[in-house]
Amino acid sequence: MIFQTTSEDLRTRARTGILNLNGVKLETPVFMPVGTRGVVKTISADDLEELEYSLILGNTYHLYLRPGTAVLERFGGLKKFSTWKRALLTDSGGYQVFSLNSLFKYEQDGVRFQSHIDGSRHYFTPNSVIDIQRTIGSDIMMVLDDCAPFDSSQERLRQSLDRTHRWAEMSVEYWEKNKNSSHLFGIFQGGIDLGLRLESLQKIVSLPFDGIAIGGLSVGEPRKDFIRILEGVSAYTDRSRPLYLMGVGTVPDILDGVKNGVDMFDCVLPTRNARNGQVFTSLGKINLRNEKWKSSDVPIDPHCGCKVCKRYSIGYIRHLHHVGELTAFSLSTYHNLYFMKNFLSEIRKSIQAGEFLKIYAKWKNLYEKPEFSG
């Protein structure tokens, strides 16, 4: 058992827990920064350790293509290659099948694709992506799945479920024959069709995965459908295992995920938005490129304790963004990841204190507005 619930909210499905990944213990709900190619863009492993992150995400598809499994094997895995000393989760490449669909072709037992880099041809199967993730050295491996677009026809959604379930069974069979210290998570699909979602959840929960993931949400569907599916599946999840909502990381989405029992989140938005000049604060979102911050001598967030806010003014960081200095990206990214760390900590404390809905309302009010106006 890698997961233990430590407290539960009495009015929602929100809970706190401990996730134990080969000796690295994490408090949940937890947010994972995304290091697609083996690094969280613009910041170092030292920064992540200073920020006290213990779990990051890497991408199997991209790491398989570059630097490639031969290099990773030579170094003893991504963690030794990058000197990352804590835990690592890798996705399987299933989402890249969805997002780069024109370059891929599904087959019965896998997916053929062309590299987006040089056009070379490759083939992923449920077994091969487990082997690749083992070479990467993942603490949590995700199974290969078929993520259909949310607006797919019933026929396409049915294909997605059948393929996802077949590949999940193949993954479990292969994994159990060749177990190591890695943990395997299953993924359920179904688009925005609640009936298919529940069918897929039932199937994936029936298999001996270490954790369960919600795939194919927050991929462009209307927000009301995102909420409807979260609420619809919440009562049927297996509370003995961690629940991971893949690719989700906005403040409102995390709040609704936690409310419905989600334990784990990842998303590129805190880091991508930082590079585009949007930062998260205790007062709401701020666009650093806005002219009104040009002469401001206050920090990004007067209530933030990160080293960026302790040292630099918002006017200075705006200037760096305005002239295209790379330091703007690293400073803004550091701040946003500090914010996310503290935000999840506040959520955990509110659940433990029986005040989650109070925190839920506070942050929803702040982050459903377009931008803090100053």
UniProtKB/Swiss-Prot annotation:
Domain of life of the source? Bacteria
**Where do the record's region annotations for RNA binding lie?**
247-253, 271-275
| Organism the protein comes from | Leptospira borgpetersenii serovar Hardjo-bovis (strain JB197)
Give the protein's recorded name: Queuine tRNA-ribosyltransferase
Amino acids binding substrate: 91-95, 145, 189, 216
Similarity comment: family membership: Belongs to the queuine tRNA-ribosyltransferase family.
Query: Pathway involvement?
Result: tRNA modification; tRNA-queuosine biosynthesis
What reaction gets catalysed by this protein?
A: 7-aminomethyl-7-carbaguanine + guanosine(34) in tRNA = 7-aminomethyl-7-carbaguanosine(34) in tRNA + guanine
User: Is Metal-binding among the key words of this record?
Assistant: yes
Q: Name one GO biological process term.
A: queuosine biosynthetic process
- Oligomer status and interactors: Homodimer. Within each dimer, one monomer is responsible for RNA recognition and catalysis, while the other monomer binds to the replacement base PreQ1.
Q: What is its EC number?
A: 2.4.2.29
Q: List required co-factors.
A: Zn(2+)
InterPro entries, alphabetically? TGT, TGT-like_sf, tRNA_ribo_trans-like
List the Pfam families.
Answer: TGT (PF01702)
User: Cofactor note from UniProt?
Assistant: Binds 1 zinc ion per subunit.
